[in-house]
């Protein structure tokens, strides 16, 4: 089973001036990324106020809209692969689902979330403009593509782009960072987050306070819990962990009986035996 040291290795906590005057204690993102904060996050390290220091700030340089600029000098090949992967484009999910609903011909890839226009690909139609299946895809199947924002509720916390995998979030959004600025923000939201595993918290996932990663540190030793922030439905991540989601019930049922029930990924679970590979301590990355 992964320990903190297995995931992150040695951790360096930074001190100094500029950004580190407020963010004292923040973890070095990687021993191979010994850059100034502003090299990736922009902003103004000499700013004397929050507004001045955070002017033009890029909160997630690894977002796919930013990655080619901030990560591409060293990781151009990886970015190109990720940008055309199914996790970014959703092409396979779109093709299979639209075919099953009778909205397109078999084997004809027409739509993508990141279309290659020169190859004749199109953006997936909006909910109002497309077929019924396109609305289903946008609100269900494609909720977890790399450009989408994650719901602010237990099990679903994550970043986007490269950080969706390489920046680890816990299921409850708890952070171990020693960044004093982030710790101050977390303390302010504690009252709101005290019921965070209850259904009444999960249903407000669009307005709940955001979570922060376990540490401000990249890793390639990605634990299964990170994969399961997206891969938790259709019997993949949840059953691997020994969780089974019962059939959905009408909202009126939950309003009367379930507001205080514990949920993960926005739903209740029954407990089953975990997958044998999980019991033996294996993680997704051991095979995938």
Model-derived features: positions:
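Short sequence/structural segments immediately N-terminal
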Residues: 1-288
């Amino acid at each position: 089973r992964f320990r903190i040291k297995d995931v992150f290795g040695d951790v360096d906590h930074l001190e100094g001036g500029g950004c580190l005057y407020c963010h004292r204690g923040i973890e070095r993102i990687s021993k191979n990324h010994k850059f100034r904060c502003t090299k990736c996050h922009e902003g103004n390290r000499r700013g004397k106020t929050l507004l001045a220091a955070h002017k033009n700030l890029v909160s997630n340089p690894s977002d796919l809209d930013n990655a080619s600029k901030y990560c591409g000098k060293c990781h151009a090949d990886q970015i190109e692969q990720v940008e055309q992967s199914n996790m970014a484009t959703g092409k396979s999910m779109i093709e299979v689902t639209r075919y099953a609903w009778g909205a397109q011909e078999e084997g004809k890839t027409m739509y993508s979330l990141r279309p290659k226009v020169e190859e004749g690909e199109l953006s997936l139609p909006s909910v109002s403009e497309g077929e019924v299946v396109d609305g289903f895809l946008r609100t269900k199947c494609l909720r977890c593509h790399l450009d989408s924002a994650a719901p602010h509720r237990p099990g679903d916390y994550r970043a986007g782009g490269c950080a969706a995998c390489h920046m680890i979030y816990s299921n409850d959004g708890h952070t171990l960072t020693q960044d004093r600025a982030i710790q101050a923000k977390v303390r302010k939201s504690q009252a709101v987050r005290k019921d965070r595993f209850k259904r009444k918290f999960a249903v407000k996932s669009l307005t709940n306070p955001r979570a922060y990663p376990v540490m401000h540190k990249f890793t390639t030793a990605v634990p299964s819990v990170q994969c399961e922030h997206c891969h938790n439905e259709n019997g993949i991540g949840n059953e691997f962990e020994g969780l089974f989601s019962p059939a959905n019930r009408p909202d009126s049922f939950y309003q009367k009986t379930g507001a205080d029930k514990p949920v993960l990924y926005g739903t209740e679970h029954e407990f089953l035996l975990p997958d044998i590979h999980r019991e033996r301590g294996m993680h997704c990355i051991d095979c995938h």
